[in-house]
Amino acid sequence: MALENPKMHNSESSKRLGAEWKLLSEAEKRPFIDEAKRLRAMRMKEYPDYKYRP
């Protein structure tokens, strides 16, 4: 989407992607959810003492 619309603001991109995400079925979302879980586990293993502190 960013390549197709290089001048689009990040907030607008996020809104559009969020709307598209809501239209996906659970089966279509599953690969992305599984990948996020895998990456989270990998980061936790690499950085076990990391704590998010805004």
From Swiss-Prot:
TM helices/strands, residue ranges: none
Entry annotated with the keyword DNA-binding: yes
Keyword DNA damage attached: no
Molecular functions (GO terms): DNA binding
Keywords on record: DNA-binding, Nucleus
Assigned GO CC terms: nucleus
Location of the protein in the cell: Nucleus
Record-linked InterPro entries: HMG_box_dom, HMG_box_dom_sf, SRY-related_HMG-box_TF-like
DNA-binding region (UniProt annotation): 1-54
Protein name per the record: SRY-related protein CH7
The organism of origin for this protein: Gallus gallus
